[in-house]
UniProtKB/Swiss-Prot annotation:
Residue numbers binding Zn(2+) 1: 79, 142, 199
Subcellular location: Cytoplasm
Name the UniProt record assigns to this protein: Peptidase T
Binding-site list for Zn(2+) 2: 142, 177, 381
Catalytic machinery residues: 81, 176
Lineage, highest ranks first: Bacteria, Bacillati, Bacillota, Bacilli, Bacillales
Cofactor entry: Zn(2+)
Species annotation: Geobacillus thermodenitrificans (strain NG80-2)
GO molecular function, one term: zinc ion binding
PANTHER family in UniProt: PEPTIDASE T
Single GO biological process annotation from the record: proteolysis
NCBIfam families (UniProt xref): peptidase-T, PRK05469.1, PRK13381.1
Length: 411
């Protein structure tokens, strides 16, 4: 499996699939189409059936059952796109055999070093084969590692027909990084009763709780007057925007929260005297707290509108996804099976909430309960991203083991 995973993964990351939140197409970028078409050909080549890609770039395929038991159809998903925050153009993966535990020079010319001093978790990977960036791009382990692991697991099952399994569906989806992954996903066509996203981080991650998530767009209109004659006339929209931000609790920001704590995150602040636009994301695991956060932002906007004039402040809040725990709890055995699969392979499951969202957050509310399992990457979305190939092998093995357990547990 190891060489197959390296070969697949290093090939996939060289396709630039950054998604674009400004685009209205699906997929949002041409590169995702390029990878989707490549995967269609590979799925056919390894012997998968019912291989399709629809007009929105969703790739689906079937591994037919080889057992007489009536096993539930399960699915595995990974996403095609990489994060828009950091360049994914001309990714040049570096392979480090038998990592020695020291500094890794990513880019000598630019003095970019991946060091255990900055990233202590590197110590866990001594002796592993690592794949890193060259310091100028992200790597794309999020989530091309998941794609490579699903492909490798399917190929393994096709090559080993003695392993009994039910029907398995796989899907590779666009635009997860900009929150649109499941928007045009056809759950009925996919036809699985349960699924797993292979989109987690380090070895053993198993997640079935995600944030409740919303975005808030605030527009503040000021009044620009020549500063020499501005007394009593000028209204500076930037200052009102600062007033808005200062009324949010300073300690409820991403840099001050972890575990089950929620936050307000000011993602963008653009403006001048005449007009300022603020863009926030709101996150909380608890539904009541989530609703309270949205209400607080509306209350601040209303108070400032009263102070400066109703036509000066507008706020628009849109929900993005909800905590998938609500939909997975009633079918908790799918989490238990993933837990057992890891334990069977000597992996310690690390069950924790996702401080983010996956496609599974939305899919679970669309009728397809979908927890998330590890894919192996570290330091996603930036130049210090890396992955252990040894962990990738374990992820592919967990996929195979989950499929085996579903068959074994069906009478």
């Amino acid at each position: 499996m190891k060489q197959e995973l390296i070969e697949r993964f290093t090939r996939y990351v060289k396709v630039d699939t950054q998604s674009d939140p400004e685009s209205n197409t699906c997929p949002s970028t041409q590169g995702q189409w390029d990878l989707a078409r490549m995967l269609v050909e590979e799925l056919k080549a390894i012997g998968m059936e019912e291989v399709t890609v629809d007009e929105n770039g969703y790739v689906m395929a079937t591994l037919p059952a080889n057992t007489d038991k009536n096993v539930p159809t399960i699915g595995f998903l990974a996403h095609l796109d990489t994060a828009p925050e950091f360049t994914g153009t001309n990714v040049n993966p570096q392979i480090i055999e038998q990592y020695d535990g020291g500094d890794i020079v990513l880019n000598e010319q630019q003095h970019i070093i991946l060091s255990p001093k900055d990233f202590p978790e590197l110590a866990n990977y001594k002796g592993h084969t690592l794949i890193t960036t060259d310091g100028t791009t992200l790597l794309g382990a999020d989530d091309k590692a998941g794609i490579a692991e699903i492909m490798t697991a399917m190929n393994y099952l096709i090559q080993h027909p003695e392993i009994k399994h039910g029907k398995v569906r796989v899907a590779f989806t666009p635009d997860e990084e900009i929150g649109r992954g499941p928007h045009k996903f056809d759950v009925a066509q996919f036809g699985a009763q349960f699924a797993y996203t292979v989109d987690g981080g380090p070895l053993g991650e198993l997640e079935y709780e995600s944030f409740n998530a919303a975005e808030a767009k605030i527009t503040i209109k000021g009044k620009n007057v020549h500063p020499g004659t501005a007394k009593g006339k000028m209204i500076n929209s930037i200052k009102i925007a600062l007033e808005f931000q200062q009324q949010l609790p300073a300690n409820e920001a991403p840099e001050h929260t972890d575990g089950y704590e929620g936050f307000y995150h000011l993602l963008s602040f653009q403006g001048n005297v005449e007009e300022t636009k603020l863009y926030y994301i709101i996150r909380d695991f608890d539904r009541e707290q989530f609703e309270a956060r949205k209400a607080k932002m509306k209350d601040i906007a209303a108070a400032l509108a009263q102070k400066y004039g109703n036509d000066r402040i507008s706020i628009e809040i849109n929900d993005q996804y909800y905590n998938m725990r609500e939909k997975i709890e009633p079918v908790h055995h799918i989490v238990d099976i993933a837990h057992e699969a890891m334990t069977n392979l000597g992996i310690e499951p690390k069950v924790k909430p996702i401080r983010g969202g996956t496609d599974g957050s939305q899919l679970s509310y669309m009728g397809l309960p979908t927890p998330n399992i590890f894919a192996g990457g570290e330091n996603f979305h930036g130049r210090y991203e890396y992955i252990s190939v040894d962990t990738m092998v374990k992820a592919a093995e967990v996929i195979v083991e989950i499929i085996k357990l579903f068959e074994q547990k069906t009478s």
